[in-house]
Design a protein with these regions (language model features):
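A short, conserved, highly charged catalytic patch centered on acidic carboxylates
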Residues: 1-115, 122-160
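A conserved structural/catalytic subdomain of Rossmann-like adenosyl-cofactor enzymes
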Residues: 412-413, 417-601
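Structural motif
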Residues: 23-29, 184-198, 256, 275-278, ...
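Short, hydrophobic/amphipathic alpha-helical patches that form generic packing surfaces
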Residues: 33-38, 195-208, 388-390, 479
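Short amphipathic alpha-helical segments and their helix-coil junctions
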Residues: 8-20, 168-189, 265-267
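Conserved S-adenosyl-L-methionine
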Residues: 300-428, 433-438, 495-498, 503, ...
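Long recognition/docking surfaces used for binding and targeting
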Residues: 188, 198-291
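Class I SAM-dependent transferase core
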Residues: 182, 281-306, 312-314
Length: 601
C-alpha cells in the first residue's frame, strides 16, 4: 500500500485490498486500512477473498431487493464473493461500542455471514451469529476470529509453533486499553492497568519460551471456555513466572484484573509471538497506557525498534564487550544488544561443534556478565529486569538508580557491578528537555558540562566559568557516558538537534571533539518519535580515545534518513530509510578503511 500512496491524488490513498484510490478519511486511515492489513498479514486471509472497493452491500430489511447497507470489509469463503459465500463482516465506523454492536448485528442478521468484527481504530470486538431452533438470532462475543483455514473450534487451540510474528501491536494495545478503561472492575488508573498488562505480557513471553513448538500454549482462550477457566490457567502461569524469577517478582505481584478482562486480553494476544516481534512489545504497551503528560513530564519517549537495531548493528557488540544503557527505560537497547550478541554466539560456536547445552550456558553467561542497564524509574527498571530475566537470565545487570548521581551514592550492589571506565559499548536515548533540569550543587559539580562556558572571541575555544544552577539531563548524560566508557569504547546516543547546531552549545561540541573520534552523525526524521514527541533528533556515534590518538583529519559518516517506517500518527508505512543505514555504514567503513578495532576495544 505504502509504495503506491505517493501516486494517489491529494486527499486520497491507495486501498490496501483493491488497489483503487479512496478518500483519506479518518475511518479509512485508522480503521479500514489497518484492519484490512491485519486480516491479510496476521490472520492469513488472501486478498482475493476480501472485498473493500467497490463495497459489498447487504439488505436493510428482509424485503429489501437493492441491498442498501455498504459493508466496510467483507470476507468470503471463496473468490466468487457472492451472497452465499460471505463469511465475515468487518464494520469500521466511528461509533461507540454499543452502537457498533447494534449495527454489526443488523449486518449479520440480514446476511449469510456468521462472524463479525467491529473495529473503530481504538476498540474492537468479535461476534458469532447463532440461529436458534425457534427462529431467533442471537449474538455471542467470542475471544477472536479463526485464521484463514481454521474452524471456529480451533480458536484458542494454538500450538507454540503456529504463533505468528506481527509487525505492529499498537492497535491491539489501544483496543485493550480502551476495553479496560470502560469495563475493568477495580483498577481504572492507566498506571495500574499498565502494570497489570505487563504482568500478563510476561506470562505470555514465559509461555512462549517454555512451551515446545508441537504443544498447545497455556496463554489462550477457547471458543467455549468460561472466563473463570481462562483466569485460573493464567493465575497458574503467573505463579510459575514468579517462582522462577523470585529476584524480580514478589508475592505482592498479583493479577488484580477481573476474569472478563483477563480473558479479553488473552484473546487479543493469543495468536501472536511476542518474543520475536519486530517492535518492542513492552515499550508499545507501556506507551499506550501511560499518557503523554506523564511520559513527557519525565522526558520518557521510547526508542523505535528500527532505530535501536540500527544503533546496535553499527556498534556491533560481541561477547567480549561490556554493554550499558544508563537510561535503559524498559530495556530496548540492552535486550536488542543481547539478541545481537546471542546470534553471533550461536553462529560461531555451532561451527565449532558445540552442543546446544554448551551454547545455552554461554548465552546465559554473556547475559549476566556483559549487559548492564540503569533507570531511575522503579516501574521501568522492573520491566527491564523482568524482560532480561525471562529472555536470558540477565536480571542481575539492571539497576534502579539515578545514573547522574555520584556513584558513591548508588546502592552497594550497583557499585559492585558498574564502574567508570569498564564499558566498551554505550547505547542510550537519555531523557531530554529544559522542563526536567538536573539541580543540586553536589550532583552538578561532578560534570564539566554543568558549568557555564564562555566562547573565546574569534576562536573555537571555550573558557569554563562558574557552576550552573541547573542543566538539561541530555547534556550531563554525554559526560556520564564518557566516564562509563573505557578508552577505545564506542557510543551511540540519541540527542536533540540543538546539541549539533546551536551556537550557544558550541562548548558541548568542543567537549566531544576533544575526547572522542567523531564516527557518524545520523539525521533522523521528525516523525521518528511521533506521535509521542515532535522533538527533532539525530544520532551521534563516537569512539572514546586519548587525545594523542585522535587523528587531526579523518572521514565522518554523515547520513540523512527521509523516512522512518511510520507517519506522524504512528501508522506503519513501508518506506523506512533507517532500516538501511547500518548496511550503508558498514560499506562506508570498508571504503574508508575504518574499524573501531583499529583503536583497541
Amino acid at each position: 500500500m505504502a509504495e503506491n500512496q505517493t501516486q494517489s491524488k491529494e486527499g486520497y490513498i491507495i486501498d490496501y485490498i483493491s488497489g483503487t484510490q479512496v478518500k483519506a478519511s479518518p475511518e479509512e486511515l485508522e480503521a479500514t486500512q489497518v484492519f484490512s492489513k491485519i486480516l491479510v498479514e496476521d490472520y492469513g486471509y488472501p486478498k482475493t477473498h476480501i472485498q473493500t472497493r467497490p463495497q459489498f452491500h447487504v439488505k436493510v430489511r428482509p424485503s429489501d431487493t437493492k441491498k442498501e447497507y455498504p459493508v466496510d470489509i467483507a470476507v468470503f469463503s471463496d473468490t466468487e464473493k457472492t451472497d452465499d459465500s460471505i463469511y465475515l463482516i468487518v464494520e469500521c465506523k466511528k461509533k461507540n461500542r454499543k452502537d457498533g454492536r447494534t449495527q454489526l448485528g443488523n449486518y449479520l442478521t440480514l446476511s449469510k455471514a456468521n462472524l463479525g468484527v467491529w473495529f473503530n481504530g481504538e476498540e474492537r470486538f468479535y461476534l458469532l451469529k447463532q440461529n436458534t431452533d425457534d427462529g431467533r438470532v442471537l449474538f455471542k462475543e467470542i475471544p477472536n476470529i479463526p485464521k484463514f483455514g481454521e474452524r471456529l473450534e480451533d480458536i484458542g487451540a494454538i500450538k507454540r509453533g503456529d504463533l505468528i510474528v506481527t509487525h505492529n501491536l499498537k492497535s491491539t494495545f489501544k483496543a485493550i486499553r480502551n476495553y479496560l478503561a470502560a469495563n475493568a472492575i477495580g483498577a481504572t488508573r492507566d498506571e495500574v492497568l499498565a502494570q497489570q498488562l505487563i504482568n500478563l505480557i510476561f506470562c505470555k513471553i514465559y509461555d512462549e519460551k517454555y512451551t515446545d513448538k508441537k504443544n498447545i500454549v497455556r496463554f489462550r482462550v477457547g471458543l467455549n471456555e468460561t472466563c473463570a477457566e481462562v483466569r485460573s490457567r493464567i493465575d497458574k502461569l503467573f505463579s510459575d513466572v514468579k517462582t522462577k524469577y523470585k529476584e524480580v517478582f514478589t508475592k505482592e505481584d498479583i493479577i488484580t484484573l477481573d476474569d472478563n478482562s483477563v480473558a479479553y486480553i488473552v484473546g487479543e494476544l493469543q495468536n501472536y509471538c511476542l518474543i520475536d516481534a519486530e517492535r518492542d512489545v513492552l515499550a508499545d504497551a507501556f506507551e499506550t497506557f501511560i499518557d503523554h503528560a506523564l511520559k513527557g513530564g519525565q522526558g520518557q519517549f521510547f526508542t523505535p525498534r528500527n532505530v535501536v537495531k540500527m544503533m546496535v548493528e553499527i556498534l556491533d557488540p560481541d561477547d567480549d564487550d561490556m554493554v550499558i544503557d544508563p537510561a535503559c527505560g524498559s530495556g530496548g537497547f540492552i535486550i536488542e544488544s543481547l539478541r545481537y550478541i546471542w546470534n553471533k554466539i550461536v553462529n560461531r560456536y555451532k561451527e565449532m561443534g558445540w552442543s546446544d547445552m554448551e551454547i545455552l550456558e554461554e548465552k546465559i553467561d554473556v547475559a549476566n556478565k556483559c549487559i548492564r542497564g540503569i533507570d531511575k524509574d522503579y516501574f521501568l527498571s522492573k520491566i527491564a529486569k523482568a524482560y532480561m530475566a525471562i529472555m536470558g537470565d540477565g536480571k542481575g545487570g539492571v539497576f534502579c538508580e539515578d545514573s547522574l548521581e555520584r556513584p558513591e551514592n548508588w546502592s552497594s550492589k550497583t557499585q559492585t557491578k558498574i564502574h567508570f571506565g569498564d564499558f566498551s559499548v554505550v547505547l542510550t536515548n537519555p531523557p531530554f528537555g529544559s522542563k526536567i533540569p538536573v539541580t543540586g550543587e553536589d550532583k552538578l559539580k561532578q560534570y564539566e558540562l554543568a558549568h557555564k562556558w564562555k566562547n573565546k572571541k574569534g576562536t573555537n575555544d571555550w573558557e569554563k566559568m562558574k557552576l550552573a544552577e541547573k542543566e538539561a539531563p541530555q547534556i550531563l548524560f554525554i559526560e556520564r557516558c564518557y566516564q562509563l566508557l573505557k578508552f577505545g569504547g564506542r557510543m551511540a546516543i540519541v540527542l536533540p538537534d540543538g546539541v549539533f547546531g546551536n551556537n550557544q552549545l558550541g562548548y558541548i561540541r568542543r567537549f566531544i571533539m576533544k575526547r572522542f573520534r567523531l564516527v557518524a552523525v545520523i539525521d533522523i526524521p521528525l516523525e521518528t518519535f511521533m506521535p509521542n514527541t515532535g522533538t527533532k533528533t539525530s544520532i551521534l556515534i563516537v569512539q572514546k580515545l586519548k587525545s594523542e590518538d585522535i587523528p587531526s583529519d579523518y572521514p565522518v559518516f554523515m547520513c540523512v534518513a527521509g523516512t522512518c517506517g511510520h507517519d506522524r500518527r504512528g501508522n506503519i508505512k513501508e518506506e523506512d530509510d533507517i532500516a538501511e543505514i547500518s548496511s550503508q555504514f558498514k560499506q562506508w567503513a570498508v571504503d574508508n578503511n575504518f574499524s573501531f578495532k583499529n583503536y583497541g576495544r
